[in-house]
């Protein structure tokens, strides 16, 4: 059983060469457009080359690929299988990233565009929710990355 979830889209109309999608996310109160114009990693590795991750405490992400492909690494110490690698494309639906989940994303050479239809609670503060955490300085994160076999999701 996986802790990784997706919010699927609904096709509500198709015409020649055009598809209309309902990509609504119930209770979403923020939308972030994240563009990787080429090969990119977010957040980037730190100064010593260690992986860095974001972790939100007051936001649930719903990351949906609009163009290209994106790979997410998810680490959540509370999950039975705490390390996941998720490959996304436009047909995957929105990857749900709950609070207290370390996450980072990687785009290939062609780049990618993702919309994050987030749900933010009243305590959300952008100045504290987007501070990268390095595996070099977070013992728990380092331990999981070096000892747990990742669950690979390819959709």
Name each model-derived stretch.
Residues 92-95, 99-105:
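Histidine-centered metal-chelating micro-motifs
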Residues 1-90, 107-113, 118-155:
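Active-site region of the double-stranded beta-helix
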């Amino acid at each position: 059983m996986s802790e990784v979830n997706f919010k699927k889209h609904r096709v509500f109309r198709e015409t020649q060469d055009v598809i209309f999608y309902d990509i609504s996310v119930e209770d979403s109160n923020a939308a972030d457009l994240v563009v990787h114009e080429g090969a990119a990693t977010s957040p980037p590795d730190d100064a010593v080359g260690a992986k860095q991750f974001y972790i939100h405490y007051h936001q649930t992400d719903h990351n949906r690929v609009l163009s290209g492909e994106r790979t997410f690494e998810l680490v959540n110490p509370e999950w039975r299988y705490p390390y996941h690698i998720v490959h996304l494309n436009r047909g995957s639906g929105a990857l749900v990233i709950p609070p207290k989940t370390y996450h980072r994303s990687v785009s290939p050479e062609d780049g990618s565009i993702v919309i994050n239809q987030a749900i933010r609670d009243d305590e959300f503060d952008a100045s504290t929710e987007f501070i990268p955490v390095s595996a070099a300085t977070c013992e728990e994160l380092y331990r999981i990355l070096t000892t747990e076999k990742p669950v690979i999701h390819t959709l």
